[in-house]
């Protein structure tokens, strides 16, 4: 089609749909014996958008994956943490089932179940939340609890979390209200002491109080397109009762709180049993017995714990699990670097002893899976720097000595004479 003002005969042209002449519209698009103006094109687009909105809910209703399907998808990206994956699969399924049935079922109002993830650094808390959002195709944003303060103090206001979520979906409120918010380092906003203080705790208990309504469900007023708030401005109204909040933290020292309760015989939930001091449980076993009273003792206020009814604990990753993480998930670290090298036309091979050495280093650093990338990056840095300037390299081999910094990666060339020259 072409943009026309007049045909070859100089006749005045009219839109075939609305009848307006070429002088009454900005553009007139010509087809075989027909014309359409820019106004009719806009109208057609609006009609199509409305129809898509009406069809979308029916499509979404049939697209909700079952807990088994959610769990299998998580298995593709997250190694281990079987109990946490099962808890998350059920909680997420129930949350979105509630949304699709209008918060009620046979007159019974369905409550909201936000999630608390407890586990050491690098155990997969953030990855689980990100993978869920990707599977469900919903907006996802992360917030760091350590940067949050009460409104009116220097720092990030809790409502900025909703603004970030809106930014992820181009300020589409309906999309944002189906999103997932992950708040990391939630343990860092614990109350500084068991006793209420006369001084204001604006980054601890104060933030917990500020988050209460947001997590439970309120209508947050957010400035459009990230502007500052002022009285004459119209705000976007976002209903947070439909947003799934997942809070995560390492909760260092919580195992000692649980151990003290269990040893003194006050544990009654999650199959907690009285243990002698000589019979020490592992940190993972203790965290699995967490009760609300332990979290209160740690420094979370009771009202805040009540807004996070689903609790999942993650274990510290073993050396074997770290090796699996390096090679088994769909986006495993070794696969990522192999794809990167393939873009240069070069194969990359990690020998088994190299994977063992990477896992041992990460265990020594106590950074969990998060530390794996920095170890691999350091080992491959010089090779990635030189490779684009080199010719005839077909393969790069990484073994244990490369990871430990004792030798350089083995380069295999396409031409034997080039390899011989490299080895001299």
Swiss-Prot record:
The lineage of its organism: Bacteria, Pseudomonadati, Pseudomonadota, Gammaproteobacteria, Enterobacterales. Belongs to the ClpX chaperone family. InterPro entries: AAA+_ATPase (IPR003593), ATP-dep_Clp_protease_ClpX (IPR050052), ATPase_AAA_core (IPR003959), Clp_ATPase_C (IPR019489), Clp_protease_ATP-bd_su_ClpX (IPR004487), ClpX_bact (IPR046425), P-loop_NTPase (IPR027417), Znf_CppX_C4 (IPR010603). Zn(2+) binds at residues 15, 18, 37, 40. This is ATP-dependent Clp protease ATP-binding subunit ClpX. Component of the ClpX-ClpP complex. Forms a hexameric ring that, in the presence of ATP, binds to fourteen ClpP subunits assembled into a disk-like structure with a central cavity, resembling the structure of eukaryotic proteasomes. Keywords: ATP-binding, Chaperone, Metal-binding, Nucleotide-binding, Zinc. One of its GO terms (molecular function) is ATP hydrolysis activity. GO terms for biological process: cell division; proteolysis involved in protein catabolic process. GO terms for cellular component: HslUV protease complex. It comes from the Bacteria. Signal peptide: none annotated. Coiled coil: none annotated.
